[in-house]
Regions:
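A ubiquitous short alpha-helical element
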Residues: 1-7
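Short, charge-rich amphipathic interface segments used for partner binding and complex assembly
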Residues: 8-53
Length: 53
């Protein structure tokens, strides 16, 4: 698959952001959690774009 390494790295980053968001929400860090959710969504969009090529 084209871009396999980049996609794998983006998957790792997206998962980390999603996991961090859950932790941050539990700790009351809502702004940081929202930022991580936005970043995760952006990573997922990048993954989709690379997979479409």
């Amino acid at each position: 698959m084209k871009h396999a390494t980049a996609i794998a790295q983006l998957e790792i980053h997206a998962s980390n952001c999603e996991n961090n968001a859950v932790i941050q929400e539990a700790e009351g860090q809502y702004e940081d959690a929202a930022n991580n959710r936005t970043n995760a969504a952006d990573y997922r969009l990048a993954i989709e774009a690379l997979q479409a090529e």
